[in-house]
């Protein structure tokens, strides 16, 4: 008995691609943000930790987000980002409490921007931006410690 390897390979490839299509029809693609504020996050004038507002932006491009100052982004996001802004939402986080935030991205979204409204904004690392795939299933960890915010890898 002779095996038809090219035919077998093609059939396997079609089954694999069909499986991906089925997975997307069963569960919508999403991006999961795991926001991990430390216990000492956003200290007040007496060095006590405080709640923090996080604003998440869905962006078509990242240049205007990277170039803007904090107060323009926070107070006037539509005017500041213009057509780069696809959507945004706010999340209030508490020190030491981990948040899981799941997002179904708009098809125009290419980047996710994250802004943290720290009390001491002058000394804070308050902005992150990273690539996003509106058709994929991504998990992103954001660690927040005192006055800094950074992406973490597993």
Question: Which residues are covered by each model-predicted region?
Answer:
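C-terminal motif of bacterial Sec signal peptides marking the signal peptidase cleavage site
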Residues: 16-19
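Short coil-to-beta strand junction motifs in C2/discoidin
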Residues: 46-55
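Short amphipathic, basic-aromatic surface patches that mediate peripheral association
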Residues: 35-45
């Amino acid at each position: 008995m002779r095996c038809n390897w090219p035919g077998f390979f093609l059939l396997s490839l079609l089954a694999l691609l069909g499986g991906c299509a089925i997975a997307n029809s069963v569960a919508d693609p999403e991006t999961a943000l795991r926001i991990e504020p430390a216990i000492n996050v956003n200290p007040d004038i007496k060095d006590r930790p405080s709640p923090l507002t996080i604003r998440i932006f869905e962006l078509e491009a990242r240049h205007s987000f990277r170039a803007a100052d904090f107060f323009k982004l926070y107070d006037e996001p539509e005017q500041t980002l213009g057509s780069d802004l696809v959507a945004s939402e706010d999340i209030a986080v508490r020190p030491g409490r981990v948040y899981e935030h799941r997002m179904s991205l708009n098809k125009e979204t290419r980047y996710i921007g994250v802004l943290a409204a720290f009390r001491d904004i002058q000394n804070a690392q308050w902005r992150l931006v990273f690539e996003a795939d509106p058709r994929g299933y991504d998990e992103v960890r954001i660690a927040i410690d005192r006055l800094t915010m950074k992406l973490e890898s597993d």
